[in-house]
């Protein structure tokens, strides 16, 4: 099986809660399943610390997705193209975002819903993106 992983939060030396959580889950999946190929989709140059396994293929996909407009491009245009190009069987996204245009099964985890409890703590465009897209992501056809 070819499993695509959203690796955009794997930034060596700059990871916080979501990055650490993402890496610990991905690392264990990769180590425990050497029979599968894992395609790590990064949005910028990556550290080889994340790609030392024989069953990992690292791929950088543009644009760097660090703003709501760029998230939209990355997830709705770049990710579906990459999934098709790399012939992924499933897409696992650990940051609460996924593509609404993918035709393969999706496994989505949502790290937190703080934007609902503390909307004023989140920048306007980020909050708007979460408010619009999180419900849509939760309605798509998951695994």
Predicted features, each with a name:
Residues 1-143:
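Carbohydrate transferase catalytic cores enriched for Leloir-type hexosyltransferases
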